[in-house]
């Protein structure tokens, strides 16, 4: 259809084409062959021996698309024929699939199947029944008889019902069979020994080939069961005993803060031992600690082979200190030096009261015969502690500020306090007057 614009005239022959479905007449619809959509369609499968659609309307698919606009004319008979074909196919499948059990194979069925053969009663003698506990055998008069029917014998039956193709198979009652209560021997199952069962029987069901092969490899490489049975039992018993001890062990209550209890006799014994050790050594705990510290102290400036006089200073650098204080002791050059206690003016009179040892005494402690009394400190003591809290206030500074600058609010308040209000001359409206110049 050509493109038209506003104002152009529309031609009937060129600008409008009737659908192809409207051009069909009733005679054309009668000539149209049946459209096959079955699976065994000869046209769609490519079999040229069957019917073919005429190419008058452009082929099968083109014709179907054209006829979609008139579904009442095309699909009315098509659906009817389609439903009939499906019903016929379903009936054929049900008849072909319907099978009777073996004991009812002689029933009369349609479609030319053989008629049912009648049953004939026969008698079968069962062997004598004995109990499991080796009871007395029964007599021949106590035998049980069961009647069976022979399918070869023809028997006339009055109540006969023909079977339809869709009906369920009929199971007729056998009236000539007399059932009596049968007594079967009681079977008691004996306990089965797992070791006597071969491995193949145990692995017959439930395991794949790979699992069976893996079990065979493990059984080939592991030691014999008899030699490892005792060891495994002992190991299992030990493991169980350890688990019992761990599970039954008392748990510590870490949340309970219990005080440490020490007997008075142990405290007195510790006091006596400490006093005796100090008296026998002849040195105070402070001197012992200082001597140990000096022994472990290393000198990075001198070698270990140097003498004591080389390690310590000769005392020249302390000459000005000694000259400034007349009460100070002279510096000795005999391999050691004296302390600087006398050089302190404020402590010149109370030097003897200070508990300071000489360096010479520290390096070579002398054994004294005096007994030093030391007061032992009890272990459970309470001391008062003065705790101070320091709060640090964080400060923020910008990139162009520094820590030395004051707070902007403080600087602004300082400027506001220093503002001087000038008195303006009343005769002039300008603040720039001679009054400010003067």
Curated annotation (Swiss-Prot):
Keyword Cell cycle: yes
GO cellular component: cellular bud neck
Subcellular location: Bud neck
Annotated keywords: Cell cycle
Lineage top rank: taxon: Eukaryota
Major place of residence: other
Functional description taken from the UniProt entry: May be involved in the establishment of the daughter fate.
Name listed for the protein in its UniProt record: Protein DSE3
Name of the gene this protein is made from: DSE3
């Amino acid at each position: 259809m050509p493109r038209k614009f506003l104002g152009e005239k529309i031609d009937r022959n060129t600008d409008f084409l009737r659908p192809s479905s409207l051009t069909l007449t009733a005679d054309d619809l009668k000539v149209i062959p049946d459209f096959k959509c079955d699976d065994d369609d000869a046209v769609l499968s490519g079999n040229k021996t069957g019917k073919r659609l005429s190419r008058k309307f452009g082929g099968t698919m083109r014709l179907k698309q054209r006829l979609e606009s008139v579904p009442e004319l095309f699909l009315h008979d098509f659906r009817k024929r389609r439903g009939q074909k499906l019903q016929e196919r379903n009936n054929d499948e049900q008849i072909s699939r319907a099978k009777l059990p073996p004991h009812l194979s002689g029933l009369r069925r349609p479609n030319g199947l053989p008629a049912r053969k009648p049953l004939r009663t026969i008698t079968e003698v069962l062997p004598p029944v004995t109990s499991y506990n080796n009871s007395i055998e029964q007599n021949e008069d106590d035998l049980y008889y069961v009647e069976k029917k022979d399918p070869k014998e023809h028997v006339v039956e009055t109540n006969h019902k023909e079977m339809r193709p869709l009906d369920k198979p009929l199971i007729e009652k056998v009236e000539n069979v007399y059932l009596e209560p049968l007594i079967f021997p009681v079977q008691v199952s004996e306990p089965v020994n797992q070791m006597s069962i071969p491995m193949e029987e145990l692995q017959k069901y439930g395991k794949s080939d790979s699992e069976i092969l893996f079990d065979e490899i493990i059984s080939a490489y592991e030691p014999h069961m008899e030699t490892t049975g005792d060891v495994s039992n002992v190991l299992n018993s030990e493991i169980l005993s350890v688990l019992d001890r761990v599970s039954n062990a008392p748990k510590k209550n870490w949340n309970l803060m219990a005080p440490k209890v020490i007997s008075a006799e142990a405290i007195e014994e510790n006091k006596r031992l400490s006093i005796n050790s100090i008296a026998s050594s002849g040195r105070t705990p402070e001197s012992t600690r200082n001597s140990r510290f000096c022994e472990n102290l290393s000198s990075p400036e001198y070698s270990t082979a140097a003498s004591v006089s080389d390690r310590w200073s000769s005392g020249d650098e302390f000459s000005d200190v000694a000259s400034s204080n007349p009460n100070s002791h002279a510096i000795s050059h005999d391999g050691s030096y004296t302390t600087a206690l006398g050089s302190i003016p404020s402590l010149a009179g109370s030097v003897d009261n200070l508990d300071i040892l000489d360096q010479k005494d520290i390096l070579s402690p002398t054994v004294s015969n005096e007994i030093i009394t030391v007061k032992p400190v009890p272990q459970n003591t309470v001391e008062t502690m003065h705790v101070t809290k320091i709060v640090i206030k964080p400060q923020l500074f910008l990139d162009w500020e520094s820590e030395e600058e004051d707070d902007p609010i403080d600087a602004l308040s300082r400027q506001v306090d220093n503002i001087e209000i000038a008195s303006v001359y009343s005769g002039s409206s300008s603040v720039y007057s001679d009054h400010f110049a003067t």
